[in-house]
């Protein structure tokens, strides 16, 4: 049996991820009028642009929902966000500035928690507003079926009858008005925005053009730091971790991780920290472009990675970065709870994060401009006396020790020379004058 329904299942319980916006409001009312028993579920993800969460379920009931629930997802979202920081699960970056996968993290939490709530209410059909060209249709599909194997999927935006009758925002607005709901369309922005407590995504419309950039965006979690009339003062902030968990900001300890994240967002947001412009590969391998905000994620990530580099050895750091790239891609693809992702994630949390205890002090300026002022940790393996250029007592090694170490390198150097000679004879290298490879004397003549 197909899990995707192409037309509305009349007379059955259908759950809809309800945002309260025009699209989902029109979809809910339309499904009700066509004979479905509609249940509305709203995820409280701490969206910074949402003024009143309690109003959303009330709207759903007005539009004909059998039941409307507000599901608080904030604690779980922050839990997953911290896990992503611990594992470095960020695979998209430009010029060293990362996209913190805030939308994929939000989808992982929304997809599992809303479907769990639906299952409690005996609702085994789920609809949402994702379109067939985006990533979310696949993310929600995976997370929904992982949570409820009996789930069937109905998306109004894949139903040709819905598209024919309510194919655009003007048609939806007229439909709502005709039904007695004076639903006024919000003014159209030059881009669309999706947000949660961890970050905001701005994309589509004018932002699809690469000659239209960050300057057309009105940040919702920070400040437009690129504007001359935007005053941004330098600020010092201290971030403390214990066993890989962020616990304090500027000496204030937080028992509630959600409260800590809200404060981290406020601090980073005052500077526009964590804003980035990325070109990425969607799940279907087509490229898309987004402008992202993630002030709290960026602040915690910077401090965490500073401690990682001061505590762990080179091979561990290398594995952390390689695994983090892979895990970030799995997260982006909607596979955050797949076994291969759990394996990578738990490894980083167990063998990297558990050693991360300490405090990092930074000076934040404009945007992603910052300086690290101090790093403290009882677990630091950074020991300046080991490599001090000054004369020290009880030096860890002597000139004679280094001579012996370099002599051992002769084995590797000899082998490397032999390989280069093979490559040169095969025509793969041009050695000598006019080449970037220096002329090498062959041991064999």
Swiss-Prot record:
Query: What EC number(s) does this enzyme carry?
Result: 6.3.4.5
InterPro entries linked to this entry: Arg_succ_synth_type2_subfam (IPR023437), Arginosuc_syn_C (IPR048268), Arginosuc_syn_N (IPR048267), Arginosuc_synth (IPR001518), Arginosuc_synth_CS (IPR018223), Arginosuc_synth_type_1_subfam (IPR023434), AS_cat/multimer_dom_body (IPR024074), AS_multimer_C_tail (IPR024073)
Catalysed reaction, written as an equation: L-citrulline + L-aspartate + ATP = 2-(N(omega)-L-arginino)succinate + AMP + diphosphate + H(+)
UniProt: L-citrulline binding residues: 99, 135, 139, 192, 201, 203, 280
Pathway stated in the Swiss-Prot or TrEMBL entry: Amino-acid biosynthesis; L-arginine biosynthesis; L-arginine from L-ornithine and carbamoyl phosphate: step 2/3
Where is this protein found? Answer: Cytoplasm
Q: Which residues bind ATP?
A: 17-25, 43, 129, 131, 136, 194
Keywords in alphabetical order = Amino-acid biosynthesis, Arginine biosynthesis, ATP-binding, Cytoplasm, Ligase, Nucleotide-binding
Q: Which residues cross the membrane?
A: none
Q: Which amino acids does the record list as binding L-aspartate?
A: 131, 135-136
Question: Which cysteines are cross-linked by disulfides?
Answer: none
Q: Name one GO biological process term.
A: urea cycle
Alphabetical GO CC annotations of the entry are: cytoplasm
Extract the GO molecular function terms from the UniProt entry.
argininosuccinate synthase activity; ATP binding; protein homodimerization activity
On assembly, the entry states: Homotetramer.
The record's listing under PANTHER family reads:
ARGININOSUCCINATE SYNTHASE
Similarity remark: Belongs to the argininosuccinate synthase family. Type 2 subfamily.
Name this polypeptide is given: Argininosuccinate synthase
Q: Which organism is it from?
A: Rhodopseudomonas palustris (strain BisA53)
